[in-house]
């Protein structure tokens, strides 16, 4: 397809930018000697899983459906070797994940046990949930390589199921710990170390030694952060969980590492991972989510109407914050918009405040002229550009994407493009009000007008089949 043939709204994922991000992650993996996993909760566009699998060691899942998706779709012909788990510089050998019991692409492979092509390297499939259902545990043990427990009670409640797999060398078992050291400011909803958090085992709740069968530790405390918060958190882990680090064979440093952000200290991360490996003789995992598809996707939307309001024009779009980019309302935040000169309530209020002044001469513009400019979306004193409010066509009054200063007020039919829309969008969207989900488009890495591939178009049946 060509760009002008695309429907709106549509998520467009850029293959070239994905590769750029993945090259950075591959460098970290190779230089640091660690393993890197895709956290599917942020980005689950399985059309590009084979590409990602060429660079990363596997995936992490937050539930059985994500684990099954990885088992079915995250496969490769070539890529980093994963199985069995490496021998570490310690006397006790780690538990290996058996290829014979690895997940299968389809029923035919399952019937032909042990017949996987030599070139096909099975990626690792990790899963963590705060609590597991009894009815799902056996299937998880069949398709996953690593199983993480959030409490000692959960570990023991499911021991009768997972222990035979663990003793047979078919699965690795770990505990999620709570370092009780918060590095978040202003986003308690995303802070696993916030007071009252249900996530992770506190030091006071740990037994004297790691429970039988447990060979790994895991913590996840970061959210869109750099290297320093990771180092700070791990120092807390060293201080409070040192004896368990000595027993463990691997540690998973969790999600939230913005490794592919331009200002991230990649060399520092490589050095830090090497330090952990050397000091504690541990296999180290990182499981970034956003970093895989950071700035690798856009959301295009069309202007359907322009409503004049008392402060600025309000544009009604065919995209919705509530339905298509839920984090805009949940965090909240103002998503980047291509061609925007400024954005956000704070920037608007700041500019409005700077524009309040008294005429110095009778020849200067009076109140009427300034009011006319403001009503046109152009605050007093602003030399160029127009402020507009971008909103949706749902019935939710608060379904507002944000305030933006643009070179001019867009017209009905114009296309607007939001940036960084590959992450936490497709995995969280919904059909409230019967809103259609955006198309999913892959922009292939080639110089051609027809480089746009329509991966998925959603329609009425997709809406209806979620209901009863």
Residue locations for each model-derived region?
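A charged N-terminal "starter" segment
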Residues: 1-79, 84-103, 109-146, 152-164, ...
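Conserved, mostly hydrophobic/aromatic
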Residues: 18, 41, 70, 175, ...
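General structural feature for long, well-ordered alpha-helical segments within catalytic domains
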Residues: 21-24, 44-48, 55, 66, ...
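Hydrophobic "anchor" residues on beta-strands that sit immediately upstream
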Residues: 37, 172, 250, 283, ...
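Active-site beta-loop-alpha junctions enriched in small/polar residues
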Residues: 39-45, 64-65, 130-132, 150-152, ...
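Hydrophobic residues within beta-strands of alpha/beta enzymes
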Residues: 59-60, 147-148, 217, 251, ...
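Active-site loop/helix belt of alpha/beta enzymes
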Residues: 163, 168, 179-310, 378-380
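Charged (often Lys/Glu-rich) extended helix/loop segments that serve as interaction or gating elements
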Residues: 272, 288-355, 373, 377-468
